[in-house]
Amino acid sequence: MAREYPLNLYRNFGIMAHIDAGKTTCSERILYYTGKSHNIGEVHDGAATMDWMEQEQERGITITSAATTTFWERTEDGATADTPKHRLNIIDTPGHVDFTIEVERSLAVLDGAVCVLDANAGVEPQTETVWRQADRYKVPRMVFVNKMDKIGADFFNCVRMIEDRTGARAVPVGIPIGAETELEGLVDLVTMEEWLWQGEDLGASWVKAPIRDSLKDMAEEWRGKMIEAAVEEDDDAMMEYLEGNEPDVPTLRKLLRKGTLALHFVPVLGGSAFKNKGVQPLLNAVIDYLPSPLDVVDYMGFKPGDEEEVRNIARRADDNMAFSGLAFKIMNDPFVGSLTFTRVYSGVLKKGDTMLNSTKGKKERVGRMMMMHSNNREEIDEAFAGDIIALAGLKDTTTGDTLCDAKDPVVLETMTFPDPVIEIAVEPKTKGDQEKMSQGLARLAAEDPSFRVETDIESGQTIMKGMGELHLDILVDRLKREFKVEANIGAPQVAYRETISKEVEHTYTHKKQSGGSGQFAEVKLVITPTEPGEGYSFESRIVGGAVPKEYIPGVEKGIKSVMDSGPLAGFPVIDFKVALIDGKFHDVDSSVLAFEIAARMGMREGMKKAGAKLLEPIMKVEVITPEEYTGGIIGDLTSRRGQVSGQESRGNAIAINAFVPLANMFGYINTLRSMSSGRAQFTMLFDHYDPVPQNISDEIQAKYA
């Protein structure tokens, strides 16, 4: 079977946004108009096609990014224009801050993105976070200002906020006509026409009309700004424009596309997905301005086993190259078992092929291959460069692994995942479920790299670690639904860290004599604090064989054993470096083990001398509240050891920004609801680690000692 759609007709893009901006509704409408789902699912009914896990439907939020393939032909006047059918692979990403990791994984495999904003709230904190992630992956994007039918909707305020908050240049290409209940349609600034949605056919048809007199001046002004941005992309067009000639429509689209792909600016459109207005122009804009796999620069990978990770192996969207792909998501499907969502970067993959997982160095066989449409699937026999597919039955592949042709191996990506900041103890309600719970947790951890499961050595308890309370709540919920395990959970605990505050030099001698050969090792260590975030490093400065080479790995092993359990309260130690500068050994009594013990004991003593201190995660908190509650909320944040860093008006509400220790934020949602009669909302994300005040540090040490 040959390729059905040429690569220039592909668009792999994600839909990203803050929680509640209407992202899932947008995806739904896209699937409806592109003919993939026959009735529109509403999030409020708990029936959206993209939100396919039961809990998502209950909570009305999106948790897993489902990947969907659908098709679209550019439409004008409700009739199809003379452009061929494009193939859209859409990834719906979650907007809730606890699931930032999902967004990160999706961005790594997308070519472009549509950022959905709430017309009333504008650029919210999570939007900024996702935007920064997209900047890091250099993803070209456009903005859809959604919910233009809401009270307080303000399109131009959103355009200003995009520029103020993200630093990007926002270029409106379509301006909504009217707002709130008066929303009628859109002025298309490229063709200078009105699109009006009037019928009762769920927005499937619309009419085009000349721009009414009352809107002409505004349309001309914004069209001028758009053309100025576009002609900056091409010297000839700029000269023509300065001589008074505007570019024609195809040229204008070409220049806008060029600027979007180069990340010089971001096209902006408005509408209301819920009211079915403005979705078709959004789809046209995806085709006009977002990249196809051919527009993306070569994907550079490195040779498996290369510790330097020199990225000198190119992979691009070309069927004739060797196969390479990236597994970006694992899902448990009730009918097929484990599904591995994979982006094919180069080459062709056929059913029955054997491929190499170059990240793990293991071979995998391709059993069933599927094209996914939200929650139903189509079996396929081969996949081509640019496709996003699901593979069933892979044994060793986890999120972020590269799959490739064993004859031409490459590692494409090493995904970095943040450390969890919160942990809870969990145990099954009935002892007989212990085994089932362990299996369930292991499968959930395979799906989600930001979730870790560990066993506490001293208490034997199972500990779940994650990115926030909602994150862990949902995982406990999934244990119950998918694995039928009822679990009891303990109170959430903060993931503290330990570090040191000054450099010390410390000598430790380990001597043990008990008849026969004894144990002897002496080490002299310099322990130095490093900058926050630099992590740990070890070096040996031994000269003249004071400690023989073969014992030095033992020294490092001893030091590392202290890293997992620091001297104050047994928390992991971060941001320090150790140098072994001198030592003594004995021809008979010294061994690797003796040096390991000496280094471990030396570190424990040395760290106490080096001013060991506890660190706690500090969260960046933003509370959006009606003005009358600000005084009480600020007072409450301060009482939680928070530092309020500023407040600003946002629409008809106030946004309060603060840094607050995570330890004081548990259950905050309930306090906030009762303080504001349920009208305020907050988001928080991990920002940095800070030293714990001495009195609290003493309490924590007493508790864990």
Swiss-Prot record:
GTP binds at residues 17-24, 92-96, 146-149. It comes from Ruegeria pomeroyi (strain ATCC 700808 / DSM 15171 / DSS-3) (Silicibacter pomeroyi). It comes from the Bacteria. It is found in: Cytoplasm. Residues 8-294 form the tr-type G domain. Keywords: Cytoplasm, Elongation factor, GTP-binding, Nucleotide-binding, Protein biosynthesis. PANTHER family: RIBOSOME-RELEASING FACTOR 2, MITOCHONDRIAL, TRANSLATION ELONGATION FACTOR G-RELATED. The lineage of its organism: Bacteria, Pseudomonadati, Pseudomonadota, Alphaproteobacteria, Rhodobacterales. InterPro entries: EF-G-like_DII, EFG_II, EFG_III, EFG_III/V, EFG_IV, EFG_V, EFG_V-like, G_TR_CS. One of its GO terms (biological process) is ribosome disassembly. This is Elongation factor G.
